[in-house]
Amino acid sequence: MLRSAAWLMLILALFLGFILLVARPVVAVACPWCFGLEKTAEGVYVEAAMPAAARQHALQLLTQAEERVGNFYGGLQHAPRTLICATPRCFERIGGGGTRVGSVGSFELLVAPEGINVVLMSHELSHVELHGRVGLWHMELGAVPAWFDEGVAVLVSDDPQYLAPARHGRDRCAAGPQADMPVDPADWRAQLEERGDLLYASAACQVDLWMIANGGPPAVPALLAKLRDGQTFDSLYKP
């Protein structure tokens, strides 16, 4: 009996360890205080050691990022719980990985110290909004190609690293579109290592040219609504 109980406790401990290792961001968003974060605004948790001035600055930049995304999409339909770290150790603890800003579906935004800026946060918030509008199940089934998702995020964030300056009547292409753009997120990451930043610029260019031909930014939420209803990207996207 005691031996069975010991085995059960061991299995339970291993299971909990696996959950904390693999699903740490999900655990962190469910219990931010368990990871040393505290609430600083509605839906926003920061590392407890973050000074008051730094908290206020982070909140201001987050608000600007939300406004940037809302302006593009015609309003925000999804408000993720946001976890902001002041130290790399905190970001590692909540499962942030190697990114500066990360997200889980449409319900969580993870921000590293170097990710506290408008461009990076609005880029990731675009992913949150896009995934939420299409639906997580549809996203898991590959409803939106990775290049489109990333290209939209670059345009939403107005990232000068990958975009040409805004000019009236002109596109934002800093690099031309490329053939065989990656569709699967894993392929995107693999090609990113090969092509580098050019991949982001090309994806943004391809999306921008499509938007110009289809009425501007409102074409994106209109497309996403149809994808959520079950239509396919290939049937809707006309270069």
Regions found by a protein language model. Give the residues of each.
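N-terminal Lys/Arg-rich, disordered targeting/topogenic segments
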Residues: M1-R3
